[in-house]
């Protein structure tokens, strides 16, 4: 059974994702695939809403590693077929299986099409004393071909950065020494371009606390700020985005905000 909720930019479909994609999503039509699958935590993930006296949950328990990897492999293969030649795929995971999923992505897409490992870093609090506190998740980025679309993002310089000094142009003098490039009046040549700092692969974005306004009651909901950044890297307005697992629906909301 399929259940649809649709507006001008978002379509939510309740169905077996692999079957639906095979039958209804056109090959080579998708610009961005974002997957936030079960993490192989071997737990039932539950989010309880006290005010509504109800809970939302999904089962992340598997018979074995092979069952889990076979499930993800089938999804990745179908997703690859739906991606256009400039598309990127982002796979969200944690330490439960990130090492396994990297190998699986190499298998499906090819080692040469690996682009980045994003580390989503955040603050968490725990009384655990038996190991280091878990405070990050991983997002693997792969492309379908070498002709992928990638849009650079720049962040602000730190307050202590001397921006003018960074942007001043340099050259080598007659002795091969690097010196500031100067105008005819001996002033230092600068530039009007101040794009900022290129985005790194470590993203420090707050984890959604239980009382966050954007919380919808789904146990593994991701922040809109995180998802918007993924879209901004890989998409232009009106590009097609595919989220096979959907979860809380936050990617669709993020895409709507950015008019994708």
Region locations from a protein language model:
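Core catalytic lobe of class I
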Residues: 1-260
